[in-house]
Amino acid sequence: DDIMAMNPSGQVPVMRLPDGRILPQSNAIMLYIAVTHRGQDLIPVDPFEHARMMSWLFWEQYSHEPYLAVRRFRKKFLNQTDEELDPQLLARGRRALGVMEMQLTFSDYFVGQSMTLADIGLVAYTRVAHEGGFDLSEFPSVQRWVARVETDLGIEHAKKAA
């Protein structure tokens, strides 16, 4: 189908439900799947913890993804050099990784004592940040968290296959 017919913003991902309804945006899709399938344990029941999870998901979309994902895309898929890239992508991406490092210095996950959708949303681009020129060795708590979440999700070997 034409992506514009499914999502007027022209963005992917888009999920078509069995009844034909369309749901755009990765975090909305992730929430829908968790609620309608076995992922309820990934969403905190406590209203405050639920709101904290949502806060991290919003933060990912506005303060993390625009820098880590965009820089990775331009380096890996458009073959742009560091000199061609906006230096703010690296600076702001490093700032985002620093925020994550501070949080993960005191906890194993972003919300509570177990993995939530916040961790799943944040790990996607963080685990491949090196492809955008980010050195995760500068963020040891983030590195340990990536390994932990990859193991929790059973995807620790997926990078090697990609």
How would you describe each model-predicted region?
Residues 57-154, 158:
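GST-like fold's C-terminal all-alpha helical module
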Residues 45, 157-162:
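Short, flexible loop/turn segments with low-complexity composition
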Residues 1-87, 91, 101:
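GST-like domain detector, emphasizing the conserved glutathione-binding G-site
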Residues 18, 123, 161:
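Conserved residues at the C-terminal ends of beta-strands
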